[in-house]
């Protein structure tokens, strides 16, 4: 085959690959949107409802590619908890203040150890459990009494 024909064939084959990758990218984007709407948002709504029973001021914001819940008590930030996704791997991010009022930021994992998980395998219950673990840890640090 002549070189220019091979070049033309190669060009059109690479276009097919690009379109296939674009479709896959769109699928993943759609799956991430579903993750936020079907797992993160219901978890945060449930948390908001329960935390407000204990006098907490709770704000939630969930979109196609982010989810955040902020908990304040008597004007003080107790925890800003976010669920983010890197590729298809979700992870929690927390922002809070220590007893001195210093802002602290931390990124974590939903499961302990080196277990692999993604948006398809992470459950609403795991999001709730992780939030509770982070929230209780922050409250203990924030409100514990110093000294004997």
List each model region and its residues:
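Short, charged, low-complexity amphipathic alpha-helix
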Residues: 1-30, 141-148
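Intrinsically disordered, low-complexity regulatory segments enriched in Ser/Thr/Pro
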Residues: 6, 10, 71-129
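Residues that form generic nucleotide/phosphate-binding pockets
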Residues: 11, 35, 50, 130, ...
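Charged, low-complexity, helix/coiled-coil-prone segments
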Residues: 14, 25-30, 68-79
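Contiguous, amphipathic alpha-helical segments that mediate oligomerization or scaffolding
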Residues: 14-55
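Long, charged, glycine-rich C-terminal linkers/tails
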Residues: 51-70
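Well-ordered alpha/beta subsegment
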Residues: 119-136, 140, 144-145
């Amino acid at each position: 085959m002549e070189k220019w024909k091979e070049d033309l064939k190669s060009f059109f084959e690479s276009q097919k690959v690009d379109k296939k990758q674009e479709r896959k990218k769109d699928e993943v984007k759609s799956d991430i949107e579903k993750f936020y709407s079907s797992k993160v948002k219901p978890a945060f709504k449930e948390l908001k409802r329960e935390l407000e029973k204990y006098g907490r001021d709770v704000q939630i914001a969930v979109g196609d590619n982010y989810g955040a819940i902020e908990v304040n008590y008597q004007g003080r930030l107790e925890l800003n908890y976010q669920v983010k996704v890197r590729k298809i791997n979700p992870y929690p991010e927390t922002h809070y203040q220590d007893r001195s009022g210093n802002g602290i930021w931390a990124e974590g994992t939903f499961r302990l150890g080196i277990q692999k998980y993604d948006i398809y395998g992470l459950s609403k219950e795991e999001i709730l459990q992780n939030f509770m673990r982070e929230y209780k840890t922050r409250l203990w640090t924030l409100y514990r009494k110093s000294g004997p």
